[in-house]
């Protein structure tokens, strides 16, 4: 059995509703629903969830660990939430959050407007910082990757959009 799948998930004040094909986690920040896998049996045990493979196949063992990790992220999301910080490095690079849109000036001839999906919010504490928050870890990471994709850090000067903890290794320019 998967080592990850063996450890139980503590609910930390979240409510879980189990049905045949869905797992719904409800907490103070919202509700997330995930499709349940048929190879994994989920058992609610007084405030903890246990994940057991239905049979001894390799696929069922792997899926028990995957389902446990997904549900643990759901519980974390509805209780604490997830956030990803981005930094803009470059002259004239700016970001501004307006409702469900993120306006970016990244050195193009036009401003870039990124539409935020439902359940994900963007904040701009300063003009060169973006904080993306939400309850779904996958969505928060996807939005952060899309915003970074508009102008990834280039390897010579390091200009572009980067994650707050990202280290950009700069190349040396050609010498004559």
UniProtKB/Swiss-Prot annotation:
Ribosomal protein found in the keyword field: yes
NCBIfam families in the record: L6_bact (TIGR03654)
Official protein name in the record: Large ribosomal subunit protein uL6
Summary of the function given for this chain in its UniProt record: This protein binds to the 23S rRNA, and is important in its secondary structure. It is located near the subunit interface in the base of the L7/L12 stalk, and near the tRNA binding site of the peptidyltransferase center.
Organism, scientific name: Paraburkholderia phytofirmans (strain DSM 17436 / LMG 22146 / PsJN) (Burkholderia phytofirmans)
One cellular component term from this protein's GO annotations in UniProt: cytosolic large ribosomal subunit
Family listed: Belongs to the universal ribosomal protein uL6 family.
Molecular-function GO terms, alphabetical: rRNA binding; structural constituent of ribosome
Subunit organization: Part of the 50S ribosomal subunit.
Gene Ontology process terms (BP): cytoplasmic translation
Alphabetical UniProt keywords: Ribonucleoprotein, Ribosomal protein, RNA-binding, rRNA-binding
């Amino acid at each position: 059995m998967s080592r990850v799948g063996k450890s139980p998930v503590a609910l930390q004040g979240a409510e879980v509703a189990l049905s045949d094909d869905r797992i719904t986690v409800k907490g103070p920040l919202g509700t997330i629903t995930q499709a349940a896998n048929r190879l994994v049996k989920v058992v609610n045990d007084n405030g903890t969830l246990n994940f057991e493979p239905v049979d001894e196949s390799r696929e069922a063992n792997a899926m028990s660990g995957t389902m446990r990790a997904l549900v643990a992220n759901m519980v974390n999301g509805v209780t604490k939430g997830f956030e990803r910080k981005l930094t803009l490095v470059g002259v004239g690079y700016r970001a501004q959050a307006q409702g469900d849109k993120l306006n970016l000036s990244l050195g193009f001839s036009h401003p870039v407007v990124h539409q935020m999906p439902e359940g994900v919010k963007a904040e701009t504490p300063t003009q060169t910082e973006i904080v993306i928050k939400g309850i779904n870890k996958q969505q928060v990471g996807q939005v952060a990757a899309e915003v970074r994709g508009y102008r990834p850090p280039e390897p010579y000067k390091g200009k572009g959009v980067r994650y707050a903890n990202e280290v950009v290794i700069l190349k040396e320019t050609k010498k004559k």
